[in-house]
């Protein structure tokens, strides 16, 4: 007799779906969302925090997808690289970092140039300008004679036209210490693509590596001139400011601390088997990255990764259970690499399906993105009846929210709501329990008080909804399930283990969001098959 299909726990991550009571510029509140509205009216729900110290960031710092998925998968507050590096600068250990000192020494001995590449803003999502200023000070202390800055402008995790201000801040610091120059600028749309759009990356690569000089304008003036043509920070074309191309014998420090958007440019610069576009590999080239972008890259890492043990995916695997992860291209690393604590390889029994994102310049041109295909993949996985845990990310609220286009963001929200209905119907057929949440806010705040487009994340909380499978009750919790208030993303993995009747390891300092019953109920904590 065939085994009954497994009724999975399905974790649905609505990327960028925050909660904000004010409906002004709120794509979520203004959208027609009958599915989410009915869930909030009928099922246990609460709000969880996704920013600041609740996710391992500085107080008041907005969360992001990497941080959110790390905390979701780890079941604990994970200290973030932003804090780790900032603390090192503050306590002085940054200036003793062996990887940074050695690249400076080799460049100095060869009388080469030291190049600093990274996102120039205080957004704190992929980088921080204070880290660049710290590197400039380090170069001065180490006796570097030629320092070249390749500035990547933001406009996504910061307001759309602050790039000129940031490069002026950098230029002032260079002049103050008497070292260095900004030699190129490029919008992150080009230099930090993560969807294998190599034509974009190539433009940034050429400006950084091919000889040339500017036209005499400063970096700030170049950026301001682009503003006058309605080109904002994210989309500034790669532009040469002055002499200082990356060449044989030079050294590079890539100071983004978040890997996903730094990888492709790194591949082009150092990967011997790179084939994204024609280029001659620059050798020798000493290359340091702030954090580990990819274990296969031939680079030196300044801040080695933190090891996270007993995370959710590992526990599920160790129990002999199968799990499934899916998302479209833009968020695929988040449900795999980041959810697994920075591990590239899947755990035993972990299956993955990558859905291609639409090939458009910006996602306001396709607000539906690939939500339908993502839902199809989830439904197929659940129907197999073999997975105890399913993790899915819907990218639409975040990726369309980043465009600052309210009308299109509303369409994105309505697309996700429609597909959520399909997912829930499929889960109901197999008795699955569905947990719906988000990794951070975004689409609930599309413009500031002055009406200017807001393209960054927010510090708002996000919903958490628990939809029990029909006829199912959460083991060990008696009758009606109630969720507690004041939770955070780190509490969701312990909640999943609670539902699956698996013990929560000591490393998981998060606490289940399910309120404990007043009367203790003795429950069999042996893993169970939640089949019908």
Swiss-Prot record:
Source species, domain of life: Bacteria
Enzyme class per UniProt: isomerase
Keywords of this entry: Glycolysis, Isomerase, Manganese, Metal-binding
Catalytic activity: (2R)-2-phosphoglycerate = (2R)-3-phosphoglycerate
Residues binding substrate: 126, 156-157, 188, 194, 258-261, 331
Cell inner membrane recorded as keyword: no
Annotated Gene Ontology cellular component terms: cytosol
Coiled-coil region list: none
Catalytic residues as annotated in Swiss-Prot or TrEMBL: 65 (phosphoserine intermediate)
UniProt record similarity statement: Belongs to the BPG-independent phosphoglycerate mutase family.
Name of the protein described by the UniProt record: 2,3-bisphosphoglycerate-independent phosphoglycerate mutase
Gene assigned in the entry: gpmI
């Amino acid at each position: 007799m065939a085994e009954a299909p497994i009724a999975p726990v399905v974790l649905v991550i609505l990327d960028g779906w925050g909660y904000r009571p004010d409906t002004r510029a709120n794509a979520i509140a203004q959208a027609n969302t009958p599915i989410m509205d009915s869930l909030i009216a009928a099922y246990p729900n609460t709000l969880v925090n996704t920013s600041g110290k609740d996710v391992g960031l500085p107080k008041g710092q907005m969360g992001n997808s990497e941080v959110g998925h790390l905390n979701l998968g780890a079941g604990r507050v994970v200290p973030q690289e932003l804090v780790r590096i900032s603390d090192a600068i503050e306590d002085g250990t940054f200036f003793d970092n062996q990887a940074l000192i050695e690249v400076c020494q080799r460049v100095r001995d060869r009388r080469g140039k030291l190049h600093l590449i990274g996102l120039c803003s205080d957004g704190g999502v992929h980088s921080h300008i204070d880290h660049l200023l710290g590197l400039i000070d380090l170069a001065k202390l180490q006796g570097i004679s030629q320092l070249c800055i390749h500035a990547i402008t933001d406009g996504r995790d910061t307001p759309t036209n602050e790039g000129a201000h940031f490069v002026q801040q950098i230029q002032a610091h260079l002049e103050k210490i008497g070292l260095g120059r900004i030699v190129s600028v490029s919008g992150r749309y080009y230099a930090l693509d993560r969807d294998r759009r190599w034509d974009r990356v190539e433009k940034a690569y050429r400006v950084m590596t091919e000889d040339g000089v500017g036209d005499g304008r400063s970096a700030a003036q170049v950026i301001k001139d682009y503003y006058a043509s309605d080109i904002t920070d994210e989309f500034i074309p790669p532009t040469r400011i002055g002499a200082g191309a990356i060449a044989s014998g030079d050294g590079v420090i890539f100071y983004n601390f978040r890997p996903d958007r730094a990888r492709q440019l790194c591949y082009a610069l150092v990967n011997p088997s790179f084939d994204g576009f024609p280029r001659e590999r620059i050798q020798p080239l000493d290359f340091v990255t702030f954090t580990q972008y990819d274990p296969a890259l031939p680079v030196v890492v300044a801040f080695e990764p933190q090891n996270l043990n007993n995370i959710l995916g590992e526990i599920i695997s160790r129990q002999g259970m199968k799990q499934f992860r899916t998302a479209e291209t833009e968020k695929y690393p988040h449900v795999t690499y980041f959810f697994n604590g920075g591990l590239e390889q899947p755990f035993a029994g972990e299956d993955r399906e990558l859905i291609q994102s639409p090939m458009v310049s910006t996602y306001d041109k396709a607000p539906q993105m690939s939500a339908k295909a993502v839902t199809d993949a989830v439904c197929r996985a659940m129907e197999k009846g073999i997975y105890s845990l399913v993790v899915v990310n819907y990218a639409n609220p975040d990726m369309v929210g980043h465009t600052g286009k309210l009308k299109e963001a509303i369409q994105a929200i309505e697309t996700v709501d429609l597909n959520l209905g399909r997912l829930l119907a499929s889960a109901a057929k197999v008795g699955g329990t569905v947990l719906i949440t988000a990794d951070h806010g975004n689409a609930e705040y599309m413009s500031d008080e002055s009406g200017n487009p807001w393209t960054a994340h927010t510090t708002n909380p996000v919903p958490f909804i628990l939809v029990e499978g029909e006829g199912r009750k959460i083991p060990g919790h008696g009758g009606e399930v109630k969720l507690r208030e004041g939770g955070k993303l780190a509490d969701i993995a312990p909640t999943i283990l609670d539902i699956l009747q698996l013990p929560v390891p000591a490393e998981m300092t998060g606490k289940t969001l399910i309120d404990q019953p007043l009367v203790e109920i003795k429950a069999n904590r042996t893993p169970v098959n939640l089949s019908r």
